[in-house]
């Protein structure tokens, strides 16, 4: 007879219960349908549906934990921890809208659940900034952008590191995994905590606009009825444009009928995309319809629809996660993974690549791994025990 060792998780499995909600979160995070997972672990889809509603029978826990861990790449302890709340798909506004599939949106939602687990751990170890986001429901988007610039003492200067600015106001800025990259970005309120989720698949300039767009949602739509027939995406876009490219700055820097080179200089100054700058200049009545179409065609032919030629802007880093993984913060990706039961690779995405510096091996070469300093930094301190 062949003898094998038994892990502590397996020894205690008979007294454990698999959380239905965590089972669902892990499945959605891996982009699997119920039929997909059921087939991989050898049960019927109806059985899996029952398990996601009521949990598997305790007699199955011992063997099922191993199957789920190997199939979904989550540690066994993840499935037996406390239940979690899964945000409603219908009440979550996605930046990509109809461009993203439901499976991709659900992968984003499940990442949101893991982000909440991570934030709970952060709050238990660090003095995390409290939310300081005013409720501007009903205010015109451009007016709201100017108001926020005023109360946050930003003046007419280019917005600095927007990730660190949001974090300094208590917003948890979280990265999305590749499985949800088509979502672009989304934001939610969970237990009075604002979250912004970002996918970094295009340009740093686009990522800054995505964050400003989601900040607009948090400011303008936190108290409004999600079923109210209003164009929230358009309002968030208008907020983001005025927040990043103030009309007063356009008038101060550009004459009537500016050249395309003038607009590109403003684009680099404000750290925004060429297309966003062109549209803002047009909306500020600086260009005729004919000029706008002409410049749009030129930018498209130069590749500005999908990239930012000539830009050396780097993806903005999180001050929160950089501190957590610093020598002062004293944490590693493995230590947090062990404490939260979130896989290390998932932490890498959630922390906007900051966890990569805590992984063994060479430093990542992705642009988002490079630092982007900012004066707007959250007051993060270690909680003394």
What role is predicted for each listed range?
Residues 1-385:
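Active-site hotspot residues in diverse enzymes, especially metal/ion-binding acidic/histidine motifs
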């Amino acid at each position: 007879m062949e003898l094998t060792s038994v892990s502590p998780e397996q020894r205690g499995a008979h007294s454990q219960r698999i959380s239905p909600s965590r089972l669902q979160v892990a499945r959605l995070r891996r982009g699997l349908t119920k039929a997909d997972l059921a087939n991989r672990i050898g049960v019927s889809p109806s059985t899996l549906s029952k398990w996601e509603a009521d949990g598997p029978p305790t007699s199955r826990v011992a063997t099922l934990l191993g199957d789920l861990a190997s199939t979904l790449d989550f540690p066994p302890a993840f499935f037996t921890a406390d239940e979690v709340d899964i945000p409603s798909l219908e009440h979550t506004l996605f930046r990509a809208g109809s461009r993203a599939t439901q499976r991709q949106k659900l992968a984003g939602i499940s990442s949101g659940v893991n982000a909440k687990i991570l934030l709970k751990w952060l709050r238990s170890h660090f003095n995390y900034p409290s939310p300081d986001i005013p409720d501007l429901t009903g205010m015109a988007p451009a007016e709201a952008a100017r108001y926020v610039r005023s109360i946050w003492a930003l003046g007419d200067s280019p917005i600095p590191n927007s990730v660190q600015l949001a974090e300094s106001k208590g917003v948890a800025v979280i990265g999305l995994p590749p499985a949800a990259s088509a979502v672009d970005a989304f934001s939610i309120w969970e237990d009075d905590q604002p979250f912004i989720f970002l996918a970094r698949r295009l340009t740093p300039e686009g990522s800054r606009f995505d964050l400003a767009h989601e900040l607009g949602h948090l400011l303008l739509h936190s108290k409004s009825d999600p079923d109210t027939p209003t164009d929230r995406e358009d309002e968030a876009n208008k907020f983001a444009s005025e927040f990043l490219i103030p009309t007063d700055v356009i008038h101060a820097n550009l004459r009537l009928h500016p050249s395309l080179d003038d607009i590109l200089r403003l684009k680099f100054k404000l750290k925004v995309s060429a297309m966003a700058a062109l549209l803002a200049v047009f909306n500020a009545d600086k260009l005729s319809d004919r000029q706008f179409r002409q410049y749009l065609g030129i930018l498209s032919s130069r590749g500005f629809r999908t990239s930012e030629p000539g830009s050396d802007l780097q993806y903005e880093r999180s001050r929160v996660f950089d501190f957590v993984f610093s020598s002062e913060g004293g944490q590693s990706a493995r230590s947090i993974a062990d404490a939260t039961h979130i896989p290390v690779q998932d932490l890498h995405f959630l922390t906007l690549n900051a966890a990569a510096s805590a992984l063994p091996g060479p430093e990542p070469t992705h642009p988002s791994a490079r630092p982007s300093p900012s004066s707007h930094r959250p007051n993060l301190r270690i909680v003394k025990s």
